[in-house]
Amino acid sequence: MAAAFGGAGYSRRGRIENPRYSRLEVCAAMTLACALAASTVQAQSDPGYYRPLTLAPADAASSGGGGGDDAKAKAAELAKQLQNPIASLVSVPIQNNFDWGAGPDGDGFQYKVNVQPVIPITLSEDWTLITRTILPIVYQQNIVGTSSQSGLADTTESLFFSPSKPTKSGWVWGAGPVFLLPTATDDLLGAGKWGAGPTAVVLKQEKGWTYGMLANHIWSFAGESGRSEVNSTFLQPFLSYTTKTFTSFTVNTESTYDWQGHQWTVPLNFMVQQLVKVGKQPVAFQLGYRYYAERPADGPDWGLRFAVTLLFPK
């Protein structure tokens, strides 16, 4: 999902009547276009290379006569786990976020890559610990004056203790601590503070639907004395539907409330995701559009998302 689950505070304003595109933006667009073209060429030259999970002859052959049904069942379960942020599934989402319209003149741009490994650890027959890390790599320009910054931003680490089985009514939940680590390589990309607080997620999955909420709150407790304190709430309600061909349609918000500045940042995300196999590797590709319903004074107007998630089922 996402991760994806993390939020960022921006400043506001946002007109894009006269957008100015940097070489980085052009290169990013060209890279994406080349990647899509390369995958298309590969798919045409080898139809078995890039395919929906339902068309996995190697899996079917290994299971005998009923292999096709077995492969479909495994694919369906994998698609279901993909929509669960605390599933017992090792995954590595790489989320590319592009935002436009920020900064004092409304011509700011930010490109953020969130590397978000998810690792479940079995504690006992009844309990699992799920670690979710968000490591952001950022390039931005014209957001703080006319300058640009690039490098690592602050890392968020969430630990969810979750029952191994859903409740009798089908609800899945997890709770634990969340930590803010001051890993930013530029003062303008991070808070300069250590932070911690509670985090929790609750969700239900039935008949192809997944719906629920992820939330956390972080207070700073140490760090650079000259920097503002961190006191922020993150809320992510989500709703998704997965088809029989393992295409998922998702709508969510990744809302942050800054209690220091009394300001909401509310991006609405609309995303589509397809689960496929690249060679023998299960991979999910996601495209999304983001509209900022509420934002600080110099925040972005809108954004796009392209994500690739590598899956490592047991």
Language model: regions and residue ranges:
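Cleavable N-terminal export/targeting peptides
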Residues: 1-73, 314
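Transmembrane beta-barrel domains of Gram-negative outer membranes and organellar outer membranes
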Residues: 45-314
